[in-house]
């Protein structure tokens, strides 16, 4: 039986990959990697790019190309068999990574290269790749005594297992709660689109009625529109206690102990490497210089946003009392009455906009924006092997008709697919030893409603923004001009700069000039009418301060959790959250809420002591976009400058240098505050 993962491929043969292929393929790739490292080191000095970095990059690339589709399938097409195979590979990968990071001979080879004459002949990207490699050796404990190195390896392996366990618990808990509603009266107030989706969910399970789930496209409409307060409360409880010791499935997929162990091990790891705590370690590879700078940034932002947030909530309470006689707003009432107030103030609702954002309009509109700014054209290919019939595949070409990169687009929520939206790399750009250039490939994944009742998929404006956001990451990866592995595309980009291209792209979703072709009624093709557009723009900053305060709550919680960890006191997760809420939250939340238990970004993603990156990059993105506002949002020269200075440079230079080259100065906070309508 041939193993499709071990047969050379341009693009992953998704339909042929079975769980039993995973462990043998990864094991073989890891053995090849180890042999290669030993062979490269054994040849002795003088080490050059060609005899050291290039061969290692190529064999690493093979490993990445084998593991990337496996890891991706684990996220979008999870099954018990695949999950088990994936779990078996995690310790193998972690052990290999530690082995490389603590390989004395390899470390010495890199140091010889950096200290020798050859280093001066390398280009900027190659120098950066060598410098990063040396930094990563330090961060893998290369300088530690043997027993500490061994402990580092044990911690790293355990952390990768715990992150995976956390993620599985969240997925299982999300899928582990559903509610069948047979009486439509219980769903009064719900938009037709949500009812149709819930009905389709039930039919797929051969049930009569409406099936509600904790997936966002099912959960949000209930919280926002359903008149039935008891149902809102029931769903809110189920959602905000996922994977915890509370709620309807209390204790079943509980992440409490998992989080505590993760935080304790991260702290121990940081201290092994000589850092005071994990926040310091996290910043060793980021733009921000030290924890105090991050805390000052977040605290300053909170001071500016809080008074406005309090005002927004007071107005909502007054509105709910005056119009609906509600004396006390419960947490499950906030979204519901906010929507009512938004309609009252601006006579507009998300649902009114939905018919104007059918999938084909939104996707093609996105491509049109990219064409106007960067001269890049997207072309669909139908002959590519995908993991689900709904997945589409596109290639990007520039004005010289050169293929720059390609991507998979997987837009709809499904069972066994993890929630949220994300971009990931499938293949990175790299110049190979034989002179050929391997082009980048990306995965773009969202969780939107699928088409129902013969209508196309209709998106909310928020979903269109999400699509643009993820595509911004995609462009960063696919339009790279860097040909050095490790610093091309999104590789090697500091985490607090990685959200710049994505948040930057969101701006076009608010521009009348762009909305003229991003929108079009699914029946008539008519673009968003001016009257609706004006209302949408007027409502743009509705509750903007509350939104920022929520982001600050997440960012401060994450950062302080890591910066203030004390082994003798344990993690103090709920206590820390309560303290942060006192500082920044204005909306009350119940004591049984268990937000941290499903905060995958920091416990199972790359945002540990790094969630602040969203707000940090928001400052960069708003300021970068303000140049477009000055020079024209479809100004090709401005677009080219952003492409040349930021998007195409990958991780080859420091983000601040790249930003200054584009903007002509350091970033300023004003543009972001103005963007959210917050008085500085």
From Swiss-Prot:
Pfam families in the cross-refs: Peptidase_M3, TOP_N
CDD domains linked to this entry: M3A_DCP
Gene Ontology BP, a term: peptide metabolic process
Key words of the record: Hydrolase, Metal-binding, Metalloprotease, Protease, Zinc
UniProt GO molecular function: metal ion binding; metalloendopeptidase activity; peptidase activity
Residues the record marks as active site: 470
Matches recorded under InterPro entries: M3A_DCP, MetalloPept_cat_dom_sf, Neurolysin/TOP_dom2, Neurolysin/TOP_N, OpdA_N, Pept_M3A_M3B, Pept_M3A_M3B_dom
Gene Ontology CC: cytoplasm; cytosol
EC number(s) reported in the record: 3.4.24.70
Cofactor note text: Binds 1 zinc ion.
Residues that hold Zn(2+) according to the record: 469, 473, 476
Catalytic activity: Hydrolysis of oligopeptides, with broad specificity. Gly or Ala commonly occur as P1 or P1' residues, but more distant residues are also important, as is shown by the fact that Z-Gly-Pro-Gly-|-Gly-Pro-Ala is cleaved, but not Z-(Gly)(5)
Cofactor: Zn(2+)
Family statement drawn from the similarity comment of this UniProt entry: Belongs to the peptidase M3 family.
Function: May play a specific role in the degradation of signal peptides after they are released from precursor forms of secreted proteins. Can cleave N-acetyl-L-Ala(4).
PANTHER family, A to Z: PROTEASE M3 THIMET OLIGOPEPTIDASE-RELATED, SACCHAROLYSIN
NCBIfam families found in the cross-reference section: PRK10911.1
Protein name: Oligopeptidase A
Lineage, highest ranks first: Bacteria, Pseudomonadati, Pseudomonadota, Gammaproteobacteria, Enterobacterales
């Amino acid at each position: 039986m041939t193993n499709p993962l071990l047969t050379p491929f341009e693009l992953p043969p998704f339909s042929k990959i079975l769980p039993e292929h995973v462990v043998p393929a990864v094991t073989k790739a890891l053995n090849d990697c180890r042999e290669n490292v030993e062979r490269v080191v054994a040849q002795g000095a003088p080490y050059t790019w060609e005899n050291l970095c290039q061969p290692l990059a190529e064999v690493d690339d093979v490993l990445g190309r084998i593991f990337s589709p496996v890891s991706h399938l684990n996220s979008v097409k999870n099954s018990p068999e695949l999950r088990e195979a994936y779990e078996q590979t995690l310790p193998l990968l972690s052990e290999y990574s530690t082995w490389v990071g603590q390989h004395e001979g390899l470390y010495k080879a890199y140091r010889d290269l950096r200290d020798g004459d050859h280093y001066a002949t390398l280009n900027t990207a190659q120098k950066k790749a060598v410098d990063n490699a040396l930094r990563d050796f330090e961060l893998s404990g290369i300088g530690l005594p043997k027993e500490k190195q061994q402990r580092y390896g044990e911690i790293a392996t355990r952390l990768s297992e715990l992150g995976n366990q956390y993620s599985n618990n969240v997925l299982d808990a999300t899928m582990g709660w559903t509610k069948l509603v047979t009486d439509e009266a219980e769903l009064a107030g719900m938009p037709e689109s949500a009812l149709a989706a819930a009905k389709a969910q039930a039919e797929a399970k051969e049930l009569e009625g409406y099936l509600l789930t904790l997936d966002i496209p099912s959960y949000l409409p209930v919280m926002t529109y359903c008149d039935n307060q008891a149902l809102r409360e029931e769903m809110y409880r189920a959602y905000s206690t996922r994977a915890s010791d509370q709620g309807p499935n209390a204790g079943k997929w509980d992440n409490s102990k998992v989080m505590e162990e993760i935080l304790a091990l991260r702290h121990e790891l940081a201290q092994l490497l000589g850092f005071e705590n994990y926040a310091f370690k996290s910043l060793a590879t980021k733009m921000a210089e030290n924890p105090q700078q991050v805390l000052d940034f977040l605290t300053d932002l909170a001071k500016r946003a809080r008074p406005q947030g309090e005002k927004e909530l007071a107005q909502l309470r007054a509105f709910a009392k005056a119009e609906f006689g509600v004396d006390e707003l419960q947490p499950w009432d906030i979204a519901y009455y906010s929507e009512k107030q938004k309609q009252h103030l601006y006579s507009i609702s998300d649902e009114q906009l939905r018919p104007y954002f059918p999938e084909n309009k939104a996707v093609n509109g996105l491509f049109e924006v990219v064409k106007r700014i960067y001269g890049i054209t997207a072309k669909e290919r139908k002959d590519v092997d995908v993991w689900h019939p709904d997945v589409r595949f596109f290639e990007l070409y520039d004005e010289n008709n050169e293929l720059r990169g390609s991507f998979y687009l997987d837009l709809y929520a499904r069972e066994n697919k993890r929630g949220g939206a994300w971009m990931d790399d499938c293949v990175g750009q790299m110049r190979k030893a034989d002179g050929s250039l391997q082009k980048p490939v990306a995965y773009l994944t969202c969780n939107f409603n699928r088409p129902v009742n013969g209508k196309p998929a209709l998106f909310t404006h928020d979903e269109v923004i999400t699509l643009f956001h993820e595509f911004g990451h995609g462009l960063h990866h696919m339009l790279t001009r860097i040909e050095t592995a490790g610093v091309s595309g999104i590789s090697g980009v500091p985490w607090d700069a990685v959200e710049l291209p994505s948040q930057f792209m969101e701006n076009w979703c608010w521009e009348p000039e762009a909305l003229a072709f991003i929108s079009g009624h699914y029946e008539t093709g008519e673009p968003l009418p001016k009257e609706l557009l004006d209302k949408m723009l007027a409502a743009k900053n509705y509750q903007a301060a509350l939104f920022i305060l929520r982001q600050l709550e997440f960012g401060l919680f994450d950062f302080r959790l890591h910066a203030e960890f004390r082994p003798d006191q344990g993690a103090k997760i709920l206590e820390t959250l309560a303290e942060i809420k006192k500082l920044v939250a204005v909306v009350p939340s119940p004591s049984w809420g268990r937000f941290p238990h499903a905060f995958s970004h920091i416990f199972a993603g790359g945002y540990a002591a790094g969630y602040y990156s969203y707000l940090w990059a928001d400052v960069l993105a708003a300021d970068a976009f303000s140049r477009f506002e000055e020079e024209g949002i479809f100004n090709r020269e401005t677009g080219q400058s952003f492409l040349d200075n930021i998007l195409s440079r990958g991780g080859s230079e420091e983000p601040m240098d790249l930003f200054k080259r584009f903007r002509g100065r350091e970033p300023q906070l004003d543009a972001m505050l103005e963007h959210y309508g917050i008085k500085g």
